[in-house]
């Protein structure tokens, strides 16, 4: 199951409000093939039939069944720093990540943080 930190919930509550919420539903988190490490996270506002529904106070998120194994145990946070602000995925299923931290690799038996890897894109932990 995906977990959202308080910072992520607060940011999403402000971002997904009003007409957007009424017309498009809630936030959908998915994993797709791509990125320099093999998989990338996707966030959008369109739910699809069959998605798992998770509620965090005022925020509802959807996770598609195909992405669920990659997202089990993931903690989504919202962080602000000198390089900007954005959502950070801490993924215990990742066996490696690219240097920019935007994509990850996953394989059987491995576990590490999806924090940016030293040495640049494609560097495994």
UniProtKB/Swiss-Prot annotation:
Pfam families: Fe-S_biosyn. One of its GO terms (biological process) is iron-sulfur cluster assembly. It comes from the Bacteria. One of its GO terms (molecular function) is 2 iron, 2 sulfur cluster binding. Gene3D superfamilies: HesB-like domain. Belongs to the HesB/IscA family. This is Uncharacterized protein in nifU 5'region. It comes from Azospirillum brasilense.
């Amino acid at each position: 199951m995906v977990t959202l930190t308080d910072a992520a919930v607060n940011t999403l509550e402000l971002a997904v409000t009003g007409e957007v919420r009424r017309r498009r539903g809630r936030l959908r988190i998915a994993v797709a093939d791509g990125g320099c490490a093999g998989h990338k996270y996707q966030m959008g506002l369109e739910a699809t039939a069959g998605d798992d529904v998770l509620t965090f106070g005022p925020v509802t998120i959807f996770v598609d069944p195909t992405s669920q194994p990659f997202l089990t145990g993931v903690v989504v946070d919202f962080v602000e720093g000198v390089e900007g602000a954005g959502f950070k995925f801490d993924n215990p299923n990742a066996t490696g990540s690219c240097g920019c931290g935007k994509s990850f690799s996953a394989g059987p038996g491995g576990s590490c943080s999806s924090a940016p890897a030293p040495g640049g894109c494609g560097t495994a932990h």
